[in-house]
Amino acid sequence: MKKFAMVFPGQGSQTVGMLADLATEYPIVIETFKQASDALGYDLWYLVQQGPAEELNKTWQTQPALLAASVAIYRVWKEKFPQLKPEVMAGHSLGEYSALVCAGVLDFQDAIKLVELRGKLMQQAVPEGTGAMYAIIGLDNEAIINACKQAEEGEVVSAVNFNSPGQVVIAGAKAAVERAAALCKEAGAKRALPLAVSVPSHCALMKPAAEQLAVTLENIQINTPTISVLNNVDVKAETEGTEIRTALVRQLYSPVRWTETVEKMAQDGVLVLAEVGPGKVLNGLTKRIVGDLQAISVNDVASFNAVEEFLV
């Protein structure tokens, strides 16, 4: 068997109708969403299947929906391939919570309530319309970081997602982000694209949300991981509850170091990255980070049927 890692996507991978075909073949999908619905007090599966998209895209509803989707897919994997265990896991932003549930660190229902709260706190921290995020395409990290420093003028703007070489997301106060995006274009960026988000994630504007999240995290049971999980903030696999909590708090206002995460997996001998969750966002990034890594996205019946040919 090839050495493989599992990676879990973050916000932006959700779609109305996701996991519909998987649910018809694997009852564990509906069971997983029922557990999530019981924790939330509303029918999450109905929202995911029926929408509308603008409801599903509200961050405090997106986050539980994606977490439940990734955990449901992982549970199908465990049922179908009990012998295929990943070497390591990681999740992009919100996906880190999915990884921690699948590695046995967080209880699923605890995590569902936690990410709903995370979404609400993030939305409360920055009034809608006052923050922004832009994807900067085709400019090196240093030039982007410099553009953000130049654009600050007393406001918050910083590089927050190092997604792949030549794809970095910046976030902060709307005017400052727009200034930084313009400076990036001047410095030679191919494109600067505004992202359709209601919250500028992973920047200093999220510190108030992080402080409140920390209070709730103190009362959450943290177990020793059964599989290593590389965190977003330090690209490290922590095993102690205190360190895991601290990393989740810092994650809210710190950059997601995804490029380094995938590079570390490759250096450690991983040959295949299995994206466990809706969409194929991480699959696309993997190929740009380490060209010879194989990447598969597992989220429907057809992709599950192809898993073994990739790994065995």
Curated annotation (Swiss-Prot):
Its EC number is 2.3.1.39. Pathway: Lipid metabolism; fatty acid biosynthesis. One of its GO terms (molecular function) is [acyl-carrier-protein] S-malonyltransferase activity. Keywords: Acyltransferase, Fatty acid biosynthesis, Fatty acid metabolism, Lipid biosynthesis, Lipid metabolism, Transferase. It comes from the Bacteria. Belongs to the FabD family. PANTHER family: MALONYL-COA-ACYL CARRIER PROTEIN TRANSACYLASE, MITOCHONDRIAL (PTHR42681:SF1). NCBIfam families: fabD. This is Malonyl CoA-acyl carrier protein transacylase. It comes from Haemophilus influenzae (strain ATCC 51907 / DSM 11121 / KW20 / Rd). The lineage of its organism: Bacteria, Pseudomonadati, Pseudomonadota, Gammaproteobacteria, Pasteurellales. The gene is fabD.
